[in-house]
């Protein structure tokens, strides 16, 4: 794996990477190495000025690193994740080595922009395989010019051991947040960005708390909308909890504290959308029923009526009805969570996902060069 430098990244993955060797590259002094997720996009909609200024340096650094690596070692295939910028840069650097492109969400939004589209098309012309975590993302990029027979929709995986239910740890986060043992706790996790749809969830709170005044809602994460949500939370003191960014090693216990997971994802005003949020898979592995929007790659994981409820995006009325349905029937909610856990264990483990990638790689390598 080749990745841009981030403090502790290579050391952490090498330690428990399961045989994956991690190489990193530098492209600027550490304080300026800001490309990636919240540090690159403002609310996942606009490129921040500082990040835009670093993009040429990032491109040069990645190009040099790929060329250097391929000169020293032989690789059967290069799989560049995010068509923009990594796929574009890799296509210019790999020479005759076969190339695959992986799609994740914001990269597709960028690839469709008029000034970038021509680069994306050239990258696709150089690629043998296209993978994506949702049918929508794959279809949107195929529309730029890529054959369906060489496209694969492959969901993300989840570590079902790390996120296993553990009733003995259910009270850790409840005590920290001041949520009583028997109170319904609805959990959302993710960056505070428009496409996560938390603003839609907040629209349901008056109705939710009128029907269930004992309910608590926890939205965990940081981002550009956090301050706005903090101001709004004053309307529901002691009922809407915003703990901010949660450390990765404490996240499983936060899921264990919850009764229901909610992520009402949306297409934002510019068409940007998540592929398949990892937190949905983590919630399923934790044995939680999931209420989410039925868009993008989410229906690959959540089965409406079986492992949770899928609702139309940007529809607070339908979202509220689904939340009240499950909060009002704890037995049914638990059964949905158990089925979700079973699906995670059988279909969404990393071994299952790796097998699907392996099939795609074999297809790519069987093509004439």
Regions found by a protein language model. Name each.
Residues 256-273, 288:
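Acidic donor-binding loop of glycosyltransferase active sites
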């Amino acid at each position: 794996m080749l990745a841009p430098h981030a403090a502790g990244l290579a050391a952490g993955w090498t330690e428990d990477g399961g045989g994956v060797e991690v190489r990193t590259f530098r492209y600027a002094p550490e304080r300026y190495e800001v490309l990636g997720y919240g540090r690159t996009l403002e609310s996942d909609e606009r490129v921040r000025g500082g990040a835009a200024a670093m993009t040429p340096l990032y491109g040069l650094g990645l190009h040099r690193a790929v060329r250097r690596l391929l000169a020293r070692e032989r690789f059967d295939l290069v799989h560049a994740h995010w068509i923009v910028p990594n796929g574009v840069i890799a296509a210019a650097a790999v020479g005759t080595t076969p190339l695959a492109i992986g799609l994740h969400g914001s990269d597709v939004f960028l690839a469709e922009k008029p000034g970038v589209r021509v680069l994306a098309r050239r990258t696709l012309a150089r690629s043998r395989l296209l993978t994506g975590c949702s049918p929508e993302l794959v279809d949107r990029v195929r529309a730029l010019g890529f054959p369906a027979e060489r496209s694969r929709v492959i969901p993300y995986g989840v570590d079902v051991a790390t996120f296993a239910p553990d009733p003995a740890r259910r009270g850790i986060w409840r005590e920290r947040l001041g949520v009583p043992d028997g109170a319904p706790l609805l959990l959302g996790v993710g960056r505070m960005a428009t496409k996560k749809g938390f603003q839609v969830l907040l629209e349901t709170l008056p109705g939710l708390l009128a029907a269930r005044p004992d309910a608590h809602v926890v939205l965990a994460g940081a981002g550009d909308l956090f301050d706005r949500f903090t101001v709004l939370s004053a309307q529901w003191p002691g009922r809407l909890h915003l703990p901010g960014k949660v450390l990765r090693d404490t996240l499983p216990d936060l899921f264990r504290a919850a009764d229901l997971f909610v992520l009402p994802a949306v297409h934002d005003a510019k068409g940007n959308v998540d592929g398949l949020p990892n937190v949905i898979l983590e919630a399923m592995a934790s044995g939680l029923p999931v209420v989410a929007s039925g868009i993008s790659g989410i229906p690959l994981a959540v089965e409406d009526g079986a492992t949770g409820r899928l609702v139309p995006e940007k529809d607070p009325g339908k979202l509220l009805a689904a939340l009240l349905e499950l909060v009002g029937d704890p037995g049914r909610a638990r059964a949905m969570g158990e089925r979700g856990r079973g699906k995670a264990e059988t279909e969404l483990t990393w071994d299952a996902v790796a097998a699907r990638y392996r099939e795609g790689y074999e297809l790519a390598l069987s093509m004439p060069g």
